[in-house]
Amino acid sequence: MEDRGLIVKTSAYIDRHRDEMLSLWEKIVSIESGTPDKEGVDRVGAVLKDELESAGVETAVIPMERFGNLLTGVWNKEAAGQPIVLIGHMDTVFAKGT
């Protein structure tokens, strides 16, 4: 069942924050971060870590040797109910310089 109120609230939030969201995406996609480019992937991770922490998220970086570090974030650690897991990646398929 669709919660129309949640959809309306989410759409309104996106509309209010569109410019800052686009600015963040532009910053992230401007970083060369191909899979073998550990330094670039780690730079993307640092940007995301700062963003998450500014939103009150508890973060941790798990160092990796060959590829980009892993980044975890926990919201509302003490909240009741089942947790929700979001997973993503910070690398791209593009070679450095392309």
Residue ranges and their predicted role:
Residues 3-98:
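Acidic/His- and Gly-rich active-site-bordering loop/insert found
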